[in-house]
Amino acid sequence: MKRISTILVGVFLATPVYAADNIHTLGTLSEIELALTAGKPVNVTVDLSLCNPGVADTPATKTRGGMRIDAYRITADGTLAFADQHFTIDRDGKPITQFIRYQIRSNGEADFTMVTFNMPTYERKGTSLAYKCAIDHGLSFRAPQ
């Protein structure tokens, strides 16, 4: 019994290591599309400090985050598009909803845009923020092998 317990503990301790080793970085749009169309869970992490402001009134930022791609669209020109929306509160404690859109083009360049709305009216709050990123430069994609 003691030997079985020791073996089980070893298996349980090794499982997270195996799972972490099983994650693959997707470095091209075709790798990302292949993983998505195969039904694999694809995660994207964002580091906006590595991206450039896309319009003049977008400030530089060190914001980072991530999400799992749940729904996506591939357009006729090969652009991969997906979005995230979340409900939160602003610095004044008032409810807002943020919509974040990602568009990845076949050359690996990407547009990241965010629009914020006051709740419950959906009145636009401020201006849109836009950043120019790229695969492996501000945006990283990972999926199981």
From Swiss-Prot:
InterPro entries: Uncharacterised_VirK. It comes from the Bacteria. Keywords: Plasmid. This is Uncharacterized protein in pinF2 3'region. It comes from Rhizobium radiobacter.
